[in-house]
Structure formats: C-alpha cells, structure tokens
C-alpha cells in the first residue's frame, strides 16, 4: 500500500513538471513564438528550474493576515488533489516482485462520489486563502471560486448519473470493467460533453479562470502568496487537472482498456501496457486544456453563470431522464435499445453543442441585431456608381484644405 502511494506521488509530480513545460511550449507554438528554451536542451529543464526558484524565494507574509488560515490554505487545496488519485485505476492486476496486485491504490463502492467530494473540498483552500489574505482582490477571487464550484459541481454530478445507470456501479474499477466492449462516450455522448465543460470550470482553467482573472483581480485568490505557498496552489491546480482528466478517461474512454485497433492484439490489456493507454488518454485531455487556453478568451461572470445554470444543469436533467427511460426498456428485454440510445445520444449532444452559443450573447444585443437587420432592409438601394458609405478624406488632404481656407481668410 505504501509503495503504491509513493508511486502515485512520483507519477503526479513528474507529470506536473512535464505538463507545465508542455503547456508553455504548446502555447508558444500556437502563438508563433519559441516558448521556454533557455534552461537545459530545448528548455526541457525549465519547470525544474522554476520549482527551485520558487523554493528559494523569500516568504513574504502581508501584515494583518490570519496567519494560521493563511498558511493552512495551500495545504487544504493540495491534500485533496493528491488524495483523489487513490481511487483511479491505472491498470489490471499485475505482478510486482512476485506479488499480484491491482494497479489502483484503493477502491470504494461510491468511489466516484468520493472523488467528487474531494474536488469540492479543495475549494475551501481557495476561499480561506482569499479571506485570510486581508485584501479585496483575493477575497473576490475566493468568492468567485465558491460560486463556480457550486454551479459546475451540480452539472458534473448529473453527468455521472447516466454512467451509473449503465455501469450498475459507482466504483471506478467496476465502471472501467463495464466498458470492455463499448466505451460510454459512444453511448452517453451528452454526459461526456457536459462533463468536459464542467471539468474545465471545476478546475478554474481558461476560459473559466475567473477566480484569478489578471485583468480584473491582479492574480485572484493567490495575489498575496509567494514562494512555496504559491507553488502549492499551482501544484494543486495541475494535479486537479490530471484528476478530472483521469476520471474522464475512466468514466467515458474505457479507462486502461486499449483503443481500437490496438485492442485486437491479444496482449493489449494485460501486463503493464494498460498503464500506457491510460496515460495517453489522460494526456489527450490535458492537451485539450492547453488548446482551450490558447484559443478562447475569458468569459464574463454573467456568461459563465448563465452557461452553468441556464444550459448545463437543465440539459443534464433532461438527458438523465432520457437515459433512464432507455435503460428501463433494456431491463424489460427490449431488443433494440442500443441503436435508440446511440441515436438519442447523438441528436441530444448536437442540440447541446448548438445551444452553447446562446449564453454568450446577451438579450439586448440580440434584440439590437434584429432591429438593425430590419432597418437595413428598409434602406433604399444605392446606385452602383455611388458608394454606400462615403469615403472620408485623407488627413493630408484635410490639412491642405484647412490651410487654403486660412490663407483665403
């Protein structure tokens, strides 16, 4: 047990170092710049150098802070992030020094709900850190983070309900075992879309990084933190990203099962190969995080709340109802439940994706667009020889005309 815990800790720390480096490299590539390239060959040691730099920095404690809560907040954020990984299955039963053991630290009948609860506990560190800093900007960042977790934790939990219905269990290992033939992403596509959006909001990442919006809150909840305390907040953020990515892999992408066509090989799901498939799937979701950060602007607070409460939560409730009805047909022996579920899943997911545009346009802007279209239709058509919009004179011509008028006067 202790060896597994140590292996998970080392796995997470190494992946955090690689994730920070790759994020900066990928952002540089997408923004047409080289990215970090100074420390080590091609900049591969940049993350390690940054970690050492943060460890050696001076610890500055602002005056007037609640010191106990101020120092405890990073720890409260970090511990649940690491603990949640104890319930993630990396692979099947393997032989380690002659001892047969599953590649999972532990499991529970309600493991997914336990992970959901741990992810919610992590927000306490953010809220307490913002409150204990004794500053306005961190406090606002903490309050935003609380509202964000409350809004998107509901949608995320509802996206799990359909998975529980078809897996027949809340255990992560049992859910992975239920996907040995068909991954749930093909049967429950709307649940995956809702979870994908919710996991980005849950981890406070772009375009949902409102608790640490630089243009509004300086650095958000960790404005007053430095040195190792800031590093712990950063570590918790990246470990949480890996936790929700691993959970998406376990719930929707077959966990450690090999993807097609590799699953045609007889030994693809035996030995240590499943660890490779699991890690590759997890890194696919991490790449989506980096891609979203490079592509999308930050949402306004009202847009973000509207997306969660007006779209994701109602859509989750409707989809759970549809999935439950189809599951009832399956239990009653209806033979064609699979094509009905797949077609319903595709249609509902397409409607959900098309509906994502509505929360990002406010009602008065939509009304203004309709009004402008009506007025444009009422305008008389101009002849082809005359431009619709008059071309203003160049600055040089305007100055010359003004000087002539002055000379005449």
Swiss-Prot record:
Keywords: Cell membrane, Membrane, NAD, Quinone, Translocase, Transmembrane, Transmembrane helix. The keyword Coiled coil does not apply. GO terms for molecular function: NADH dehydrogenase activity; oxidoreductase activity, acting on NAD(P)H, quinone or similar compound as acceptor; quinone binding. Coiled coil: none annotated. The chain crosses the membrane at residues 2-22, 68-88, 108-128, 149-169, 182-202, 247-267, 272-292, 306-326, 334-354. Belongs to the complex I subunit 1 family. It catalyses: a quinone + NADH + 5 H(+)(in) = a quinol + NAD(+) + 4 H(+)(out). NDH-1 shuttles electrons from NADH, via FMN and iron-sulfur (Fe-S) centers, to quinones in the respiratory chain. The immediate electron acceptor for the enzyme in this species is believed to be menaquinone. Couples the redox reaction to proton translocation (for every two electrons transferred, four hydrogen ions are translocated across the cytoplasmic membrane), and thus conserves the redox energy in a proton gradient. Its EC number is 7.1.1.-. It holds the Pfam family NADHdh. NDH-1 is composed of 14 different subunits. Subunits NuoA, H, J, K, L, M, N constitute the membrane sector of the complex. GO terms for cellular component: plasma membrane. It is found in: Cell membrane. It comes from the Bacteria. It is a multi-pass membrane protein. GO terms for biological process: aerobic respiration. This is NADH-quinone oxidoreductase subunit H. Its main location: membrane.
């Amino acid at each position: 047990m202790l060896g597994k815990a140590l292996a998970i800790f080392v796995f997470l720390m190494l992946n955090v170092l690689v994730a920070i480096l790759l994020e900066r490299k990928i952002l540089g590539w997408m923004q047409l710049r080289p990215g970090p390239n100074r420390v080590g060959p091609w900049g591969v040691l940049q993350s390690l150098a940054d970690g050492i730099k943060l460890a050696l920095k001076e610890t500055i404690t602002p005056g007037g802070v609640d010191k106990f809560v101020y120092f405890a907040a990073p720890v409260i954020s970090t511990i649940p992030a690491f603990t949640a990984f104890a319930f993630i299955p990396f692979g099947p039963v393997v032989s380690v020094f002659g001892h047969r053991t599953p590649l999972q630290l532990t499991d529970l009948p309600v493991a997914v709900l336990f992970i959901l609860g741990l992810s919610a506990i992590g927000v306490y560190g953010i809220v307490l850190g913002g409150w204990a800093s004794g500053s306005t900007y961190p406090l606002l960042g903490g309050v935003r983070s609380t509202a964000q977790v409350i809004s998107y934790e509901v949608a995320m939990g509802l996206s799990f309900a359909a998975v529980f219905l078809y897996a027949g269990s809340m255990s992560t290992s049992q859910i992975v075992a239920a996907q040995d033939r068909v991954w749930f992403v093909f049967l429950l596509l709307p649940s995956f879309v809702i979870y994908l959006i919710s996991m980005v909001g849950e981890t406070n990442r772009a375009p949902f990084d409102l608790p640490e919006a630089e243009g509004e809150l300086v650095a958000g909840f960790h404005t007053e933190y430095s040195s190792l305390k800031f590093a712990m907040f950063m570590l918790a953020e990246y470990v949480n990203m890996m936790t929700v990515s691993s959970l998406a892999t376990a719930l929707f992408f077959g966990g450690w099962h090999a993807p097609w066509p590799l699953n045609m090989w007889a030994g693809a799901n035996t030995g240590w190969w499943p660890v490779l498939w699991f890690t590759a799937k997890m890194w696919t979701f991490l790449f989506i995080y980096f891609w979203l950060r490079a592509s999308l602007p930050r949402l306004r607070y009202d847009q973000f709340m509207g997306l969660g409460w007006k779209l994701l939560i109602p859509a989750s409730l409707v989809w759970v109802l549809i999935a439950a009805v189809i599951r009832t047909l399956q239990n009653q022996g209806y033979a064609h439940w699979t094509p009905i579920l797949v077609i319903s899943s595709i249609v509902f997911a397409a409607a959900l994706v098309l509906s994502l545009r509505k929360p990002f346009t406010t009602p008065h802007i939509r009304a203004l667009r309709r009004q402008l279209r009506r007025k444009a239709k009422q305008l008389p058509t101009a002849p082809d020889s005359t431009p619709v919009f008059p071309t203003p004179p160049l600055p040089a011509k305007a100055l010359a005309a003004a000087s002539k008028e002055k000379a005449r006067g």
